[in-house]
Amino acid sequence: MSAHTRTTRKTVTAIRSTKGIGSLVSLTAYSAPMAKLVDEVADVIIVGDSVGMVLYGMPDTLRVTLDMMIAHGAAVVRGAAQACVVVDLPFSTYQESPAQAYRSAARLLAETGAQGVKLEGGTEMADAIRFLTERGIPVMAHVGLMPQQANATGGFRAQGMDPRSAAQVFDAACSAEQAGAFSVVIEGTAEALARHITETLTIPTIGIGASPACDGQVLVTEDMIGAFDAYTPRFVKRYADANAVMRDAIRQYAHDVRQGVFPEPAHCFGYGKPLQLVGAADAAA
């Protein structure tokens, strides 16, 4: 492949420069095949710690480990050629101190090849965000409904629905920008609040259950295509029923095997040709 035809991956600088220009498309991916599909349209692929719930059947994201995120992040980077890949820092790998956050983030980027990390929090994580960005690690912040903090906030509930909560979310987003974040994910907040944050910040906001006014949107891909039906958030729009398609294919396969119609000759090697064994007579003797 020549230098003129080589695909150029989007950088965090390019993503940041899109503020106010069009809408960023973002989706999640946890594997190389899914990343390859999403990469055809996405500006940003987020390797979310939601992998624990979507792929591993966990009840929440708290059990996801850094090793898991590194394995899935590396797979996504291998599968995606042009999107900016951002990988979540999982629970308990960054909250203790800026130094802990740096160790986790540095290892994650070094072992995956991703372009940035995402962490939950703004105001309380400002020191960590600043510590990372000053040392060359791009950070995407996450405010509003923060799944890693669901136990402390009363579950998966919309945030910013009253003046006090709204002020806290707004301050968190502003703190994240001031600390050096290149983008902010706003999840599960009052629409007017997400709109106000977007109008205030000079970095792109990416909404998930937030506002159409955000600079971009993200959904969990399996939610969007109907491949995960354990729970469907209110803010998800389903564009397909992938589970139904896969279920039909699996049932058809089982039927064909039980009826003896699979495999067909086209699926076999040398079907119908007589068996020839060199040295078979000698072996029998």
Curated annotation (Swiss-Prot):
Record-listed Mg(2+) binding positions: 49, 88, 120
EC number from the UniProt entry: 2.1.2.11
A Pfam family recorded for this sequence: Pantoate_transf
Compartments, as annotated in UniProt: Cytoplasm
Free-text remark on how the cofactor is bound: Binds 1 Mg(2+) ion per subunit.
Ligand binding (3-methyl-2-oxobutanoate): 49-50, 88, 118
Pathway the protein contributes to: Cofactor biosynthesis; (R)-pantothenate biosynthesis; (R)-pantoate from 3-methyl-2-oxobutanoate: step 1/2
Coiled coil regions in record: none
CDD domains on file: KPHMT-like
A GO molecular function held by the record: magnesium ion binding
Recorded family membership: Belongs to the PanB family.
UniProt protein name: 3-methyl-2-oxobutanoate hydroxymethyltransferase 1
Originating species: Burkholderia lata (strain ATCC 17760 / DSM 23089 / LMG 22485 / NCIMB 9086 / R18194 / 383)
